[in-house]
Curated annotation (Swiss-Prot):
InterPro entries: Cyclin-like_sf, RB_A, RB_B, RB_fam, RB_N. The gene is RBR. It comes from Vitis vinifera. SMART domains: DUF3452 (SM01367), RB_A (SM01368). Residues 406-856 are annotated as: Pocket. This is Retinoblastoma-related protein. The keyword Nucleus applies. Gene3D superfamilies: 1.10.472.140, Cyclin-like.
Amino acid sequence: MDGVKPVASAEQGGAVEARFTEFCKNGLQLDESTFAQAMKLFEESNHLLSTTSLSAIGNGVPEDSERYWFAFILYSVKRLSEGTAENVQQGNDENGFNLCQILRVSKLNIVDFFKELPQFIVKVGPILGNLYGPDWEKRLEAKELQANFVHLSILSKYYKRAYLEFFSTSGSNLDKQSSVISASGYVSDYHRFGWLLFLALRVHAFSRFKDLVTCTNGLVSILAILILHVPISFRSFTINNYPRFVKKGNKGMDLLASLCDIYETSEDEVRKTMEQTNKVIVDILKKKPCLASECKSENLASIDPDGLVYFEDLMDESSLSSSINILEKDYDAAIRNKGELDERVFINGEDSLLGSGSLSGGAMSISGAKRKIDSLASPAKTITSPLSPNRSPGILGGANSKMAPTPVTTAMTTAKWLRTVISPLPSKPSAELERFLTSCDKDVTSDVIRRANVILEAIFPSIAFGERCVTGSASLMDSIWAQQRRMEAMKLYYRVLEAMCTAEAQVLHANNLTSLLTNERFHRCMLACSAELVLATHKTVTMLFPAVLERTGITAFDLSKVIESFIRHEESLPRELRRHLNSLEERLLESMVWEKGSSMYNSLIVARAALSAEVNRLGLLAEPMPSLDAISMHINASCGGLPPVPSLQKRESSPGQNGDIRSPKRVCPDYRSVLVERNSFTSPVKDRFLALNNLKSKLPPPPLQSAFASPTRPNPGREGETCAETGINIFFSKIIKLAAVRINGMVERLQLSQQMRENVYCLFQQILNRRTSLFFNRHIDQIILCCFYGLAKISQMNLTFREIIHNYRKQPQCKPQIFRSVFVDWSSARRNGKTGKEHVDIITFYNEIFIPAVKPLLMEIGPGGGTTTKTNRVPEVNNNNDAQCPESPKISPFPSLPDMSPKKVSAAHNVYVSPLRSSKMDALISHSSKSYYACVGESTHAYQSPSKDLTAINNRLNSTRKLRGALNFDDVEGLVSDSLVAKSLYLQNGSCASSSGAPLKLEQPDT
């Protein structure tokens, strides 16, 4: 924060301070201690309110930014003061406030708050560190709270749909099944009771941030309680005639088995959760339980009573109101002094507080317009097209087959894969895997087993992450949960490791895999990948990626080396989990591998020695990987919320020394394209990978173990090339692929020429190869956006940065902080006398850093400087530290796309079939080519059928052809040609709803 800090005038500053005081004193009625803390943070950060970079928060209006700023300050103070001695002395005072109260006073909604919070964190982070200590970000738990909100939004809708399926609100069947909430805002007391009981279950039986699968099991147990106790006059079903209830012998319908069948949950887990739910009812509501088999109630008619507990007066009209009040008070006490979300908001009808639009949480999102993915640039072998049938087990079969999958049902499906495919496997290496382990120079079986136990214990500790104090049943349940997740990850690890060893032995024609099986980093990457899939399946809020990297001691670059192999060698992996791994690799490529502490830099300084000075000056090298003994000692010494091993959090501070840290990536055996999705459980739209011509695909792939060899070791498959050089070249080719997808999306959205696309693509490649340091500590999209504007300026195009940013906002991968917060090291820039490091807006970065470095390259590509087609090899630059290294990827024209989708169903006729759902259509089809397509159930014109649309489309494509009433498959002239389909199938990113906020309100930069 060494940049210029413009401060408002004394008069303006006094007015802002007065409004903040009013906000705290009258709006939230803060006590003196909390107000003093809030005022201190306000005074420390007040100068930031007047900076131009903050004007883009919210709608860009100063008053709007001010309200956000006030809310951020109060949220930070509330969260970070928890657990302090001063706060503990206050106890459960009456001045407690939570996030919802802050937002009501500031007139903001939850979605917008979490969207803008990252900007505050980036700007005020150093101040928060000074005031609250280095662990402030962990204690703030902003990402966890956001993911928790997303999960609860999904769960509340799931619960509402389920409630409407079984109950009415008026004692008779509902005529309108769209909402539990009536026009007057009334919510059924039974519906409210169920949600409050669910919240009590989360507070007393689950940990604070429980995973989605466990919470879904909890909701199913709540449904069982409601079915057993809500008066039958409110049922919208009958036990004997409801087709989705399975029967069990002569005793009647097995309620829990039926509900588990409907909602794809584990019956064993739901029965255990049911016990916890009954205990909450006994402990909090003081109701007396009795065995259902010993009770006589009309509610129990035709239900098998075995194993069920019944509470005589639980939902009697006389006691329901009292029970709701007790649950309300219990929840109030639980959240009083925690600045968390008041989870009752989901049944209070406060839509204005909830907000609308897209908000991601882990691998999930809530969105009106589903977030699409940029294709992941991984030269991985295609396993199956996502257009092909899903091979994972239990995909919404039976009665569910006609239901559109929801985030919850999809999560339960992947959980079923773990339960049915992975859980039955042995928890130790199989005989085949042991054969490989014992065939090494020394038997490594015991080492592999010990490492798996230590690493997975670090990822899934017996005490929940971040818990201040967990006692009783919640602690026991977390311990059991962690043990189950460890076993699932371990079994998956052994299974995939065996498959990899088998494949590697075939490549090497030998069973001795000592180099691979004794490599510590390889095994940790495999364990991290296995654990991440388990965490992604259960949607664990407290272990959002990249938490597994921190706890295993590996870096993003390390993990990127095993993802594609992991996918390829686990054929049963559900499609959603494949997409999750692919989305992680995209995140690694776009920014994480460029962050400080990435082991990529350890390979880069070997492959390109001229960059070592800059890498060392910025302190970018990875720290040595912590030893297994260090991790084991930390586990034994840990108790609850202790932070991870210190070295896992300080990878950026010192260079790595282990030879295997700088592990180069192996060449893949197949460079075909793969369809992937980013948001695993939101039915995202699938884009395709680009096939690049600059990869040396004709060379045989080296064995997997060479990927983890020392960077300085010669690569036996590439004469005269070190493993580091091979790895960096492959890594760069993947970056270029990802950039090609994103460049193409922006060109389509901006409606630019194909020549402009070629030029931007060429410039990006040249920057990557000749000005590599521009990527350090930055996001590749920041470079892409600058490439667009730089070429537009030099080509004298009428394209402003404002237009570029406005259209970039509509791209699926857009996050506001990408163009609002770009890393700058002024000491290396030597501009304007500035020193130090800070984050600036993208226009400042463009003017001060990008243009001085890239201007010569722009001149080469711009008018009069040649075109991409004339430049097959990047010219060497004398005395340039970023000069292209030997044998780096050559500059290539923009890649052509493989003919993958729609699928050609006839070799004789030009007929293509694409089983698109309507939710996926928009992003696959560009604005310019949308009129060529018709999707079942949608029309290109009002009040027309798809069959008429097909005729209309063919008429437009063949204007000289006579009108036909139906498609004639014998007449090629009447059908869409191959060339037209190929031309139309450039990767498009669709029309995603623009994120809130205005474009940058800054002057256009000058070159």
